[in-house]
Amino acid sequence: MKMYYESDVNTDALEGKTVAVMGYGSQGRAQSRNMADSGVNVIVGLRENGNSWNLAKEDGMTVKTFSDAAKEADIIHILLPDEIQEKVYNEQIAPYVEAGNTISFSHGYNIHFGLIKPDEDVNIVMFAPKGPGSRVRTTYLDGFGIPGLVAIEQDATGDALQLALGMAKACGFTKAGVIETTFKEETETDLFGEQAVLCGGLTALINAGFQTLVEAGYQPEIAYFETCHEVKLIVDDIYEHGFGGMWKDVSNTAEYGGLTRRDYVITEETKKGMKKVLSEIQDGTFKKQFADENATDAANLKEMRAAEDQETIEVVGERLRKACGLQKDD
């Protein structure tokens, strides 16, 4: 494993260069502000008068259309949703990309799956924080940062790695450490983590536990606390201290019960399912399905979202969070 820290990196390669951050969502807003505060010349590319246009201006950023930002940029850092990157790149960015420019990402999806295909005379790089945009910004303001990844798909100028690491440092990532990877590895492991564990697997596990208790006659509110609410406490402990630290912090009853009963829940069949998830990422099945979904304006996804909102655990959870003063206004 190759890891880069503050002392390994300087931002000299960025001097005199303009970075155009395309998009101003959670990551776009955080990364552009961090780089600007670190002295990098940053402009933001957006859809004119879109939802983020005024917000970026209020934040003091220089805001331009995608095309105008691409014309001025030496480095084009694309932080748009995966499903619209290809269209925006081909129509509003690619016509203005010049030899020696750098095309940058924080997720390798569109490059790895061949949806965006820059010419051979430009750099293709990635620097990616391992955390949400809110943490990217708050840890930077606290004088630290969150861990990150860096990858080089194409080095046309000979200094692509220095450019990517310079931006990672300007965002604060090298204070925690930046691990070298590849676009393939980042894309496939990121998608797998989201689908099998973090977003798909975890929510399914929580809901199954909740339903098991409710179906056995326990109060839904108690079931929610025991299977959903307390997840954060355990995850925070693992985040800071690992599995070993978590086991030390819970009671002996919880430790013994967890270690002797977890195989009832996560079985070899579960692992077979995880391997299927990974296989469909690797062979392009998921990419095709996601593209087909977006071709229908995400009709199926919208139906699934609506169904999720009606799940008993969601109804009970919202009621409890409000009652306990835990729910923040959107």
From Swiss-Prot:
| Active site: residue positions | H107
Q: Which class of enzymes does this protein belong to?
A: oxidoreductase
Q: Where does NADP(+) bind?
A: Y24, G25, S26, Q27, R47, S52, D82, E83, I84, Q85, G133
GO MF term (any one): magnesium ion binding
Question: How is the cofactor bound here?
Answer: Binds 2 magnesium ions per subunit.
Q: Quote the record's binding site residues for substrate.
A: S251
EC numbers on record:
1.1.1.86
Q: Which InterPro entries match?
A: 6-PGluconate_DH-like_C_sf, KARI, KARI_C, KARI_N, KARI_prok, NAD(P)-bd_dom_sf
Name its pathway: Amino-acid biosynthesis; L-isoleucine biosynthesis; L-isoleucine from 2-oxobutanoate: step 2/4; Amino-acid biosynthesis; L-valine biosynthesis; L-valine from pyruvate: step 2/4
Amino-acid positions noted as binding Mg(2+) 2 in the UniProt annotation, renumbered to this chain: D190, E226, E230
Which PROSITE patterns does the annotation name?
Answer: KARI_C, KARI_N
Q: Name one GO biological process term.
A: isoleucine biosynthetic process
Answer yes or no on keyword Amino-acid biosynthesis: yes
Question: By its UniProt entry, which PANTHER family does this protein fall under?
Answer: KETOL-ACID REDUCTOISOMERASE, MITOCHONDRIAL
Please name the NCBIfam families in this protein's record: ilvC (TIGR00465), PRK05479.1 (NF004017)
* HAMAP family, per the entry: IlvC
Q: According to its UniProt entry, what is the function of this protein?
A: Involved in the biosynthesis of branched-chain amino acids (BCAA). Catalyzes an alkyl-migration followed by a ketol-acid reduction of (S)-2-acetolactate (S2AL) to yield (R)-2,3-dihydroxy-isovalerate. In the isomerase reaction, S2AL is rearranged via a Mg-dependent methyl migration to produce 3-hydroxy-3-methyl-2-ketobutyrate (HMKB). In the reductase reaction, this 2-ketoacid undergoes a metal-dependent reduction by NADPH to yield (R)-2,3-dihydroxy-isovalerate.
What is this protein's record name? Ketol-acid reductoisomerase (NADP(+))
Tell me which species this is from.
Methanobrevibacter smithii (strain ATCC 35061 / DSM 861 / OCM 144 / PS)
Gene label: ilvC
